[in-house]
Amino acid sequence: MRLLHLDSSILTDTSVSRQLTAQVVQDLHAAIDDLHATYRDLAAVPIAHLSGAIAAGFRPLPQPASDAALVAEHALSEQLVDEFLASDIVVIGAPMYNFSVPTQLKAWIDRIAQPGRTFRYTANGPEGLAGGKQLIVASSRGGMYTQGPMASLDFQEAYLTATFGFLGVRDVHFVRAENQSRGPEPAAAALISAQASIADVVRSVGRGVGRGVARARVE
């Protein structure tokens, strides 16, 4: 069983999303035997944003790239897709920045969203090719976006649900800590609530992974 763990917060010791992903991963290891993890810190070791030259490597080139830096970028793109496709569980730390996700996380998504690898176009419309995974997103936000007047400004969780759904990932679980910029008491209460929700999420993921393994054996 393979786990892909990504953090994207630009903060370190004070990062709420990093605290949550660490607890999620710890609980997953305790709940699932023989779980092998791959970790990427997308803020500490950022991935270059997509360019025309990098995107050209998503499909066969008339002739191989000769520039060493570009060759390395094409190889990285393949490595990122391979890591994602090989994973059974993906854990992503995704704080809300300016109503959306960190640019570091967007750079990773732009590398793995590749036609022919993680999705394809058919006569019946687009089809995701990365199904069967369990995705856990540790979401931290300064205000309240699940309800109320700020809900229409949520381009973070909505974006992640839509994007991974397009790639075929339907089992998306959120561990959510809101109100992190509303003062110490609301922030602490929201963090405690988020931490308390992790056990249920891990149990749900464990059941989902079991169903996925059973389907794979039948197929």
Roles of regions detected by a PLM:
Residues 1-94, 101-103, 107-110, 114, ...:
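N-terminal beta1-alpha1-beta2 submodule of the flavodoxin-like/Rossmannoid cofactor-binding fold
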Residues 147-219:
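Glycine-rich phosphate/pyrophosphate-binding loop and the adjoining helix
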Residues 4, 38-40, 136-138, 173-175:
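Hydrophobic/aromatic beta-strand patches that form the interior of the parallel beta-sheet core
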Residues 115-120, 170-171:
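Short, structured loop/turn "capping" segments at alpha-beta junctions
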Residues 8, 140, 177:
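Cofactor-binding loop segments of dinucleotide-utilizing enzymes, especially the Rossmann-like FAD-
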Residues 121-166:
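Short, glycine-/small-residue-rich phosphate/pyrophosphate-handling segment
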Residues 87-88, 132, 169:
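Short, well-ordered alpha-helix to beta-strand connector turns
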Residues 94-95, 139:
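Glycine-rich, N-terminal phosphate-binding loop of Rossmann-like dinucleotide-binding domains
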